[in-house]
Amino acid sequence: MAKKEVAKIKLQIPAGAANPSPPVGPALGQHGLNIMGFCKEFNARTQDQKGMIIPVVITVYADRSFTFITKTPPASVLIMKAAKIEKGSGEPNRNKVGSLTMAQVEEIAKLKLPDLNAAGLESAIKSIAGTARSMGIDVK
């Protein structure tokens, strides 16, 4: 018989830097999970992606065990890293803060494709380009 699923917890944690402090501790603690066990396993799985924010979906079972799935970093984080900026524009229509080439956008789209709800690479590229434009980044 399959384990009974109690909850799904979605968090965004810096790769290789999960620790029991908020937001990880309280989110897992209220479901009675082993916080340090999760932190060690997450850090081991994401140590090669240091410096990135990694979304994780933790599935909690009735016997207080858990499994988790790591996803690709958010598109906005990948775009900011490619454009070498700290944050997007407060007024994206007026103030442009950086620029990306179509090759860079395509590379980000290929990386994000497994997690995107896109029909194919073309639509994924359009989605990433739209995200970049909404952050005040020119796509050339």
From Swiss-Prot:
One of its GO terms (cellular component) is cytosolic large ribosomal subunit. Keywords: Methylation, Ribonucleoprotein, Ribosomal protein, RNA-binding, rRNA-binding. One or more lysine residues are methylated. The keyword Disulfide bond does not apply. GO terms for molecular function: large ribosomal subunit rRNA binding; structural constituent of ribosome. GO terms for biological process: translation. Pfam families: Ribosomal_L11 (PF00298), Ribosomal_L11_N (PF03946). InterPro entries: Ribosomal_uL11 (IPR000911), Ribosomal_uL11_bac-typ (IPR006519), Ribosomal_uL11_C (IPR020783), Ribosomal_uL11_C_sf (IPR036769), Ribosomal_uL11_N (IPR020784), Ribosomal_uL11_N_sf (IPR036796). Forms part of the ribosomal stalk which helps the ribosome interact with GTP-bound translation factors. NCBIfam families: L11_bact (TIGR01632). HAMAP family: Ribosomal_uL11. Part of the ribosomal stalk of the 50S ribosomal subunit. Interacts with L10 and the large rRNA to form the base of the stalk. L10 forms an elongated spine to which L12 dimers bind in a sequential fashion forming a multimeric L10(L12)X complex. Belongs to the universal ribosomal protein uL11 family. This is Large ribosomal subunit protein uL11. It comes from Desulfovibrio desulfuricans (strain ATCC 27774 / DSM 6949 / MB).
